[in-house]
Swiss-Prot record:
Gene Ontology cellular component annotations, sorted alphabetically: endoplasmic reticulum; plant-type cell wall; plant-type vacuole
Deletion phenotype: Reduced male fertility due to impaired pollen development and abnormal pollen exine. Enhanced susceptibility to powdery mildew caused by the biotrophic ascomycete Erysiphe cruciferarum.
InterPro entries: Papain-like_cys_pep_sf (IPR038765), Pept_asp_AS (IPR025661), Pept_cys_AS (IPR000169), Pept_his_AS (IPR025660), Peptidase_C1A (IPR013128), Peptidase_C1A_C (IPR000668), Peptidase_C1A_papain-like (IPR039417), Prot_inhib_I29 (IPR013201)
Sequence motif Prevents secretion from ER, location on chain: 358-361
Tissue: Expressed in roots, stems, flowers, buds and green siliques. Found within columella, lateral root cap cells, and in the endodermis, the cortex and the epidermis during lateral root formation. Expressed in the abscission zones of the flower organs.
Phylogenetic placement of the source organism: Eukaryota, Viridiplantae, Streptophyta, Embryophyta, Tracheophyta
UniProt-recorded name of the protein: KDEL-tailed cysteine endopeptidase CEP1
Family per similarity comment: Belongs to the peptidase C1 family.
Keyword Signal belongs to the record: yes
CDD domains tied to this protein: Peptidase_C1A
Length: 361
């Protein structure tokens, strides 16, 4: 078990069905053109502001637009786009959507101990690229909404993946069950840890489906009838050795892996496409899942990361993050807190309890 809880507030991210707004050189040439762009942006994303607030937010918006514009003119491997967060400062974004208090948990619980077991330690031959989406082991991108449940989404991606690998059946599982019922140490919309969620699933005998226990984006009372109708079980979990992208690669070559990252930077805030190489630290504040890796034509290595902010953010809900950097923690700390579920067979819980629940519904 990890020595501290990741994601106290997680990323309370909400994305509308609208996509990012395109703009051009003429839109940033003058104060008037920027104001017109701001009004278009507000209409595009249905953002209501008072007259007083508009004046304040317009200055923030100008700063962000210019940052996006200047960044996209540079020879970078990724692009930014003006999205829902166009008039939020970088600090507001970090405070609201990346507000995890990880240092407190580190000091309180101490550094985690060395990994006891890593089943892929002796794997020496790896494919040059892996994409579990192409292998049918990844469900469509989901949206956590205004709830700090990224830890639950990260957990579910990994469990859905290993279940499909073992059974050849892809089942969308319930994040809401984790939010409502895994509350002994995890804290629902106020954050949690993937390792604890894996152990909860193991101890409860499995996790039910999203169809049976749909997502509400809020803390609700645990529905024990639904909780007692598991459809997918696991046998525990293991941690990837800390600060080793090589070991993370070994794990991802065999199954999707839950990871924590620092997602609070402005470039992450406005990421749209390409291999992300932007500035970020190791203040882990968001749970995501690595579902593959690869290399671009020009030789840039990357991780394929599934997010939980809907398909409108990034590359249809995904971000490619640079892999193999010189810092041992990996870009944005991606190699610091990786773990994956264990499933030793192709069997799952009996459908009797699920069928009984469906009869009641």
């Amino acid at each position: 078990m990890k020595r501290f809880i990741v994601l106290a507030l997680c990323m309370l991210m909400v994305l509308e069905t609208t996509k990012g707004l395109d703009f051009h050189n003429k839109d940033v040439e003058s104060e008037n053109s920027l104001w017109e762009l701001y009004e278009r942006w507000r209409s595009h994303h249905t953002v209501a502001r008072s007259l007083e607030e508009k004046a304040k937010r317009f200055n923030v918006f100008k700063h962000n637009v210019k940052h996006i514009h200047e960044t996209n003119k540079k020879d970078k491997s990724y692009k930014l786009k003006l999205n829902k967060f166009g008039d939020m400062t970088s600090e507001e974004f970090r405070r609201t959507y990346a507000g995890s208090n990880i240092k407190h948990h580190r000091m309180f619980q101490g550094e985690k101990k060395a990994t006891k077991s890593f089943m892929y330690a002796n794997v020496n031959t790896l494919p040059t690229s892996v994409d579990w989406r192409k292998n049918g082991a990844v469900t469509p991108v989901k949206n956590q909404g205004q709830c700090g449940s990224c830890w639950a989404f990260s957990t579910v991606v990994a469990v859905e993946g290993i279940n499909q690998i073992r059974t050849k059946k892809l089942t969308s599982l319930s994040e809401q069950e984790l939010v409502d019922c895994d509350t002994n140490q995890n804290q629902g919309c106020n954050g949690g840890l993937m390792d604890l969620a894996f152990e909860f699933i193991k101890e409860k005998g499995g996790l039910t489906s999203e169809l049976v226990y749909p997502y509400k984006a809020s803390d609700e009372t645990c529905d024990t009838n639904k909780e007692n109708a598991p459809v997918v079980s696991i046998d525990g979990h293991e941690d990837v050795p800390k600060n080793s992208e090589d070991d993370l690669m070994k794990a991802v070559a065999n199954q999707p892996v839950s990871v924590a990252i620092d997602a609070g930077g402005s470039d992450f805030q406005f990421y749209s496409e390409g291999v992300f190489t932007g500035r970020c630290g190791t203040e882990l504040n968001h749970g995501v899942a690595v579902v593959g890796y690869g290399t671009t034509i020009d030789g840039t290595k990357y991780w394929i990361v599934k997010n939980s902010w809907g398909e409108e953010w990034g590359e249809k809900g995904y971000i490619r993050m640079q892999r193999g950097i010189r810092h041992k923690e990996g870009l944005c700390g991606i190699a610091m807190e990786a773990s994956y579920p264990l499933k030793n067979s192709n069997t799952n819980p009996s459908r009797l309890s699920l069928d009984s629940l469906k009869d009641e519904l």
